[in-house]
């Protein structure tokens, strides 16, 4: 983000109309129960960071603040980062990714991907040199408990992706309402589009196939 800030400042000095934005990836899932979390967070593995409660001082889910203020896990860990940026004069405009999904801003890109998953698969496999799972699909629905993990896609008819989850429940995900998300390789360019991003510094890990 500091590289982005330097580019923004340089662009402004050159007379360009530039703005620094920071996309908050709070639609991404909780990967595991980290050492600072209570074991009760086990139930939230696979759930989106912007949709689960933040930990309290004991590492337990702070349900009261989540229900009263909407203070999420993502908010909790974003706050000190933003404060540190503010101290050095960096104040980007924030774009919560989960909000963008829920507002339907990913709908057009999601439709393009879901309408032709074979083309997406071919590109990823050709560029990366690896084979995707046979059940791979370019949309990750939320299951019956709100997790992105353990689902099998059973069908697609715009705007609905049909699924069966690990609990044996069947359901459908509306790609226009953010009832799931795109895999990161598709999420990334999609948000460039509707956020009008023209430049984004990134690490070599993101540049790898």
Say what each PLM segment does.
Residues 1-121:
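N-terminal Rossmann-like or analogous alpha/beta NTP/dinucleotide-binding catalytic cores
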Residues 116-122, 126-209:
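Alpha-helical recognition segments enriched in aromatics with Gly/Pro capping
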């Amino acid at each position: 983000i500091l590289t982005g800030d330097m580019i923004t400042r340089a662009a402004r000095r050159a007379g360009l109309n530039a703005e620094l934005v920071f996309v908050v990836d709070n639609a991404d899932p909780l990967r595991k129960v980290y050492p600072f979390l209570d074991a009760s967070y086990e139930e939230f593995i696979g759930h989106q960071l912007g949709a689960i409660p933040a930990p309290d001082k004991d590492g337990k889910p702070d349900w009261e603040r989540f229900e009263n203020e909407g203070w999420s896990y993502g908010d909790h860990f974003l706050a000190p980062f933003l404060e540190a940026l503010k101290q050095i004069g960096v104040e980007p405009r924030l774009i919560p990714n989960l909000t963008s999904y829920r507002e339907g801003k990913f709908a057009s890109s999601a439709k393009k991907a879901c309408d032709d998953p074979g083309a997406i698969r071919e590109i990823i496999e050709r560029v990366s040199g690896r084979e995707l799972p046979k059940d791979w699909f370019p949309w990750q629905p939320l299951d019956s408990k709100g997790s992105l993990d353990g689902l099998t896609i059973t069908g697609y008819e715009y705007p609905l992706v049909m699924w069966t989850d690990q609990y044996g429940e069947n359901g459908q995900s509306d790609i226009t309402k953010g009832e799931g998300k795109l895999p990161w390789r598709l999420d990334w360019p999609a948000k460039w589009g509707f956020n009008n991003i023209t430049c984004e510094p990134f690490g070599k890990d993101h540049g790898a196939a």
